[in-house]
Amino acid sequence: MICNLLETISTKCQSLITNKKSFFYCALLMSLLSFSQSKISDQKVFLITLDGLRWQELFLGADSLLVKNENYVKHPEKLYDWAWREKPKDRRLALMPFVWNEVIEMGQIFGNRNLGSKVNLSNGMWFSYPGYNEILTGKADDQNIFSNDKIPNPNETILEQFAKTYDPVKVAAFASWDVFDYIVNQERSGVYTNCGFESSTDLPLNKEEILLNQLQNQIPSPWGTVRLDGFTHQYAKVYLDKHQPDFIYISYGETDDFAHDGDYESYLKAAKNTDNLIKDLWKYAQQSNYYKDKTTFIITTDHGRGTNPIDSWKGHGDEIEGSDQAWIIMFGKGVSNKGEISKTNQLFSNQIAPSIREFLDLPQKKEEGYGIPINLN
């Protein structure tokens, strides 16, 4: 990678500089390599998260104990009709057709624990802010990140690292949850964020942004801190059109909030809708000369949920078994096609940021606790 090459050459140059001529050639070489790092690489990354979607629904589809349970489903027969199939592979296909029809043929899907593929959190909190910090930095920080309070993240995310290394306009974050301004530390990082119920401030606004701002104020959300994912998705697409970012992060939130509400029907509908939103982003990338054949998609979740007792599916946290169980999907440039990983392996959420650093030629963090890139060969 170019960053590693720069570091090596810098060290060599320091040992070689004994006169002005050597200094001149080393400085010229370093400047050329730095220019190539920021101008030549055509790698793009779309990082996407689905808040609190269990691995069980992703890999097995609708839960037999919940799909007709009137405590959690208002219209059991309607849900059963579209979501239920006898075989798990058919159920998951009904729930997330893009993932199981198309992504499985062009990437790698980790986290089916029934097949021995495991993904876990390395943080000990097992809820959202610590989970997103781990995903976006590559390291758990239980000492500083132990609540969902709106506290500026003391840690540098890969978004901030990208903004400082390259062009800050070429990176952005869009999220349904209003805490992300603090998770990304928008004020310090300078990364453009549009989170919660924020209107677009990406001046000058175009017609789409003006309309989205109006609609967001006119259409109520079921929650006070999380907007509907359709707004997050459309704000992100407008930014893609206006700025063609090389690194974009989109965080969808409906799955977690419907689960907390105990509404299994809406939880499944949100998962199915998000599958379609991801398909829309992939289609967008394939129709763009800027993104086609140059883009890696990485999709994951910030935490799992409970299974036993049955009511624990609504919640998560270190007191609920299974809340540390996650999953990872990767496809696109640089990802070999292995489909659903069926061999025994153990990944952690702290490996996502290092993998993105590798894709985007960003320096790796070498301190203890940081994950290592995922082996995609």
Where are these regions (language model features)?
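Bacterial Sec-dependent N-terminal signal peptides
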Residues: 1-42
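Metal-dependent active-site segment of extracytoplasmic phospho-/sulfohydrolases and closely related
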Residues: 46-47, 55, 274-314, 356
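Short, structured active-site-proximal loop/turn typified by the sulfatase FGly-forming signature C/S-X-P-X-R
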Residues: 56, 60-125
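Short, solvent-exposed loop/turn and secondary-structure capping segments
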Residues: 56-62, 114-115, 146-148, 174, ...
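Histidine-centered active-site microenvironments of extracellular/periplasmic hydrolases
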Residues: 69, 300-331
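Catalytic-site neighborhoods of secreted/periplasmic enzymes
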Residues: 124-215
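Non-catalytic, well-ordered alpha-helical segments in soluble enzyme domains
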Residues: 165-166, 343-376
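Active-site His/acidic residue clusters
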Residues: 234-280
